[in-house]
Amino acid sequence: MSHQKILILDFGSQVTQLIARRVREAKVFCEIHPYDVSEEFIRNYGAKGIILSGGPSSVTEGDTPRAPEVVFQLGVPVLGICYGMQTMAQQLGGKVMTAEAAGKSREFGYSEVRAHGHTALLNDIADFYSPEGHGMLKVWMSHGDSVMELPAGFVKMASTASCPIAAMADESRKFYAVQFHPEVTHTQQGRAILERFVHGICGCGTDWVMGDYIAEAVDAIRRQVGDEEVILGLSGGVDSSVAAALIHKAIGDQLTCVFVDHGLLRLNEGDMVMEMFARNLGVKVIRVDAVDDFMGKLAGVSDPEQKRKIIGKEFVEVFQVESKKLAAAKWLAQGTIYPDVIESAGKGKKGAHTIKSHHNVGGLPEDMHLKLLEPLRELFKDEVRELGIALGLPREMVYRHPFPGPGLGVRILGEVTLKAAHLLQRADAIFIDELRATHATERDVAAGACTEADIGKSWYDLTSQAFAVFLPVKSVGVMGDGRTYENVVALRAVVTSDFMTAHWAHLPYELLGRVSNRIINEVRGLNRVVYDVSGKPPATIEWE
């Protein structure tokens, strides 16, 4: 099926993927490509519109990225965001200056933008109106440079107290640009602005739906794989489960899943995964006991990046061993999704700053004997869940909280040991049990922990991800008449719509107290429980 589509040119922003997510939520297909793709590619792509992303560079420096000139020659609408606005202004004859040179303040965080005039992009979109009747937007800013002089043909579309030109437009050519970030949830009308651009200005319809994606993905997998066999690393998490279902739908018994039990899974997860997949998917699954291998490689290693690399490499080596038992296995399938790729910032991502590597994309050796199949790498987590439901997977599987590929290896801070893993498994299970068993009440609404629409829902469903973390410290305690000196665990629960940004979950105190009491009383070796109240940013969701 041929889609109407938007081309997103990436200048290295860590939230470029969010632009794609918002566009797809508007049921418009889009793809992200590096800013320096060829003119031929852009001309042949057939985009209904082009979006220029943000980025960490400064257009005031001569060797930093620029948009291909063809972008402004195609005759299609263009939207510049943050750095995208700055490079648009500079390339079309405007003037951009650093905050220091302009004598202005940098803007990072919330800001109020005042709209100027009536443009196709912002007309009638506002969070509130000033006493003078000006439309006002609450937005998220993250910039040091600013446009100080407009290019010919442009008008000022918005401003802030610190940024005289916070948005600009050339309506005749349908060129628009905003200094703020409409793609992040902090910009309250961001979704409306992007929908206005793709639907109202670019003229795109709504032809991106998951049913169509399944048909296209199945066809693509069949063409890519042919009659060769595929081996997939199954963790029991959402991503690998949906990948398995999609690939199985495409090639059936050509797929063999390998479930690696490395001792770093959730409590009793190995048995549950085997039972679930035998009952629900009918997929061939081989269970591999690799606890000793993984623990041996991880012994003495405390650096989180090294742990991730070791775990990723060991996974691949296990798959290679198993693939030799499958005469026709030529492909290694993985449940890599967009957030994995953006946070790794490793492949096809020029100028981005690495946050951390993922085992799916950061630990693959160059001499890997298997070709790589990643059918979900262009999907966000919510799209993966939607795909799983469309494929017929049970809700309890699809809406299970995410679990990192390296497992508890990145939830045990410092050196990974079996003792720490066993303690953490039991503490984590208690936390999840209590979240499932506790439901939101009117009292929680009054405390501001949730909304009236959440009453009756379990706190497991009201949190996007929740887990325990084993800390590499001990604390003094008192149990009975005796002094204890035992380990500490941290509880982490977040609420997010995209896993790119997140807020810590305001769990009821009674729930937290109950979890803490159970862990300390039921898990010998733990005597203190703490709760993580950090958002993302500045923290990441996982501790390592």
Curated annotation (Swiss-Prot):
Gene behind the chain: guaA
Gene Ontology cellular component list: cytosol
Residues noted as binding ATP in the record, renumbered to the chain: S235, G236, G237, V238, D239, S240, S241
Domain GMPS ATP-PPase: 208-400
PROSITE patterns xrefs: GATASE_TYPE_1 (PS51273), GMPS_ATP_PPASE (PS51553)
Keyword Phosphoprotein in annotation: no
Annotated Glutamine amidotransferase type-1 domain residues: 5-207
Entry keywords, A to Z: ATP-binding, Glutamine amidotransferase, GMP biosynthesis, Ligase, Nucleotide-binding, Purine biosynthesis
Function: Catalyzes the synthesis of GMP from XMP.
SUPFAM superfamilies: Adenine nucleotide alpha hydrolases-like, Class I glutamine amidotransferase-like, GMP synthetase C-terminal dimerisation domain
Origin superkingdom: Bacteria
One GO MF term: GMP synthase activity
InterPro entries: Class_I_gatase-like, GATASE, GMP_synth_C, GMP_synth_GATase, GMP_synthase, GMPS_ATP_PPase_dom, NAD/GMP_synthase, Rossmann-like_a/b/a_fold
Keyword ATP-binding attributed: yes
Catalytic reactions on record: XMP + L-glutamine + ATP + H2O = GMP + L-glutamate + AMP + diphosphate + 2 H(+)
Protein name listed in UniProt: GMP synthase [glutamine-hydrolyzing]
Quaternary structure and interacting proteins, as annotated: Homodimer.
Catalytic residue positions: C82, H181, E183
Pathway: Purine metabolism; GMP biosynthesis; GMP from XMP (L-Gln route): step 1/1
Entry EC number(s): 6.3.5.2
